[in-house]
Structure formats: structure tokens, C-alpha cells
Amino acid sequence: MDTLSYKTISANKATVTKEWVIVDATDQTLGRLGAKVAKLLRGKYKPNFTPHVDCGDNVIIINADKVKLTGNKWNDRVYLSYTGYPGGQREMTPARLIAKPNGEERLLKKVVKGMLPKNILGAKLLNNLYVYACLLYTSPSPRDGATSRMPSSA
């Protein structure tokens, strides 16, 4: 028995193949969509997943303005932020965030960011996410060898 064939192969930046995935957010629940996108960005579905390497795909979310929230979460859910100064805690509801310029993109990025690791790798993974409020988008085109596909689960 050859013991060398049983060694675990760890992915690195040179061996990772990144694809472009287009996800349509029309009538999808915000949290469930965010979880699927975070899994795609992280690359957890790939057989050569390595926790400390960016082995996920590039994700393009279209129709971000058509995402839905169940119940009365548009007004009841509160996102907190802190300016760093005394009395600087700010509250934002999804309805008020959507009303701002680029609010749909900011809302989806905020949700996905909360589902990624809170470290340097998580910040790099967030750069692989492109969010557009409408169907028409201008994004970096896929490189040679990369494919564009629509996942059946997302």
C-alpha cells in the first residue's frame, strides 16, 4: 500500500479555480439568500475547500431591489452601528436603508458580510461579491478558463 497517495492536499492560491456565479434575488428571502451567497463566496461546497484560502467563487447578485423579508421585518429589524464617539450608536432599519442611494446593494452586502468570517480573509472574500439592484449590470468579465453558471440551489 502506497502511503503517499493518502496525503491530504491543501488548496492554495495557484491551484484554486474561481468561477463566476450569477444569482437572481427576485422573491428570495434575504437571510436565506445571504447564507447561500456566503457559502458560494467561501467555497465550502468544493471538494478541495481549505479554511485559510480564498477558494470560493465570484458572485454577482442581480435584482437586489426585489428581495423580500417576511413578517414586518422591513420596519422592526434594526441594524446597529457605532461611530466610536460617546452617544454615537446609530440605528438603521432595512426600509430606511433601502431608501438611501445604493441601499439595496448596501443591505445585501451587510447581510452577507455578517455571515462571513470576521477576519482578513472575510474582508477579501467580500471583494468577490458584486450586487446590482436591477437586471442590467456592468461587471468585470470572467477571465479565460472561468465559466459563468447559475446554481440550482441559489
Question: Would you name each region that the model predicts?
Answer:
Residues 2-84, 89-106:
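Ribosome large-subunit tunnel/peptidyl-transferase-proximal elements
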